Amino acid sequence: MESVETPVKDGLLYQQHMKFGKKCWRKVWALLYAGGPSGVARLESWDVRDGGLGPGGDRPAGPGRRGERRIIRLADCVSVLPADGESCPRDTGAFLITTTERSHLLAAQHRQSWMDPICQLAFPSTGECSSGSGQAESPKRGFVPMEENSIYSSWQEVAEFPVVVQRTEATTRCQLKGPYLLVLGQDDIQLRETSKPQACYSWPYRFLRKFGSDKGVFSFEAGRRCDSGEGLFAFSSPRAPDICGAVAAAIARQRERLPELAMSPPCPLPRALSLPSLEPPGELREVAPEYELAPSRKLPLTDPGPQSLPLLLSPTQDGTASSLYASVCKQTSKHKATVEHLYENVFMLEASPGLSNGGPEAQEGPPGGRSPLGSPIYHNSEELSWPGSAHDSNLEAQYRRLLELELDDAGGAGRPGAQTGIKAKLVTLLTRERKKGPAPCDRP
């Protein structure tokens, strides 16, 4: 029983098929039906036999003239496209109908007259193959040109990546292996199991030392402050470059949120344009007394030479005093070099070998416990102090005063031999000082 439906379009087409392993074209009579209460939208084709085309407009003369019927369901169509590269019969154009099951290559003298109604029935909501120019332009009249937002929802699109943990020293220590889900948050990277929403490890962006991707592997170096400890973590994924780019974008966004990180890095301090000038050692001058610094801040301007302070002579184990001390303090002046102070311990111990011929009684100490060998100018009493402005400025007068003190001390001890030695020593020193002509000065 023939169908009572009226086709939307019918006519002669050529359909490609395989015959003995070769591509061949055969003539078919095609009928295009629209969907309705009695059937679905479809394209039916019949083989044409023995040139049985009637004179009534390319229709078969009767049922006996028809061959095998083939049906293409338009609801299963995926695409309807022209096939310009295919070889087809003369004065025809080829077009390809692709369905969910297979593809059909057809040819017609006016292929566009077939493609447009097929597209209208197969894709009714799009209206891509609308034949009227007014219908095609009507939806475009109210269209406002707009651009795609490249960053819209980009964070959500690249938030989660399926990865496989690569074996490294850090992953072995953390007992990580197999597939995981790498989640990129706003502040950190989280590693989650595919079946559990809880994060196994998290690495804040500010604690990552390095990160990068190479040959399908995304890796980063974690710092000591991370929960997993420091080390290299590697994950293989076909979207490794996307993961690396997402991490770089997240770090850039986090840097913008922190004002202290957005500021320019601190510049080094400028070098000093000039340094304090130091004069050569030969040009150093003496500081005036009124500009003299505090004792804790005094700096030696010149080398005054060796000095020794007066010390209290204490007897050794054998009862003899240590060797004699001498101290000479000189002060260098810019104009004239003068002797500031000169003194010498002239006390000679006759009881000591090589200095005197005293007997053993000279080595015995007095009942008071203090050794008589110590000179009065070396003890800490106030009987003798450094010569100042109140004392005689004459050097000879100073030695006479020392002589009187020595004589008083020696007279109390009853040692005439010591007086003779002291006198001889003082005479020698006074004679030597008279020849030099010392200039009197005060002790600083």
Curated annotation (Swiss-Prot):
GO terms for cellular component: cytoplasm; plasma membrane. Residues 7-123 form the PH domain. Residues 47-66, 354-390 are annotated as: Disordered. It holds the Pfam family IRS. Residues 157-261 form the IRS-type PTB domain. Keywords: Cell membrane, Cytoplasm, Membrane, Phosphoprotein. SUPFAM superfamilies: PH domain-like. PTB domain mediates receptor interaction. On tyrosine phosphorylation, interacts with CSK and INPP5D/SHIP1 via their SH2 domains. Binds ABL1 through the PTB domain and in a kinase-dependent manner. Does not interact with RasGAP. Belongs to the DOK family. Type A subfamily. This is Docking protein 3. The gene is Dok3.
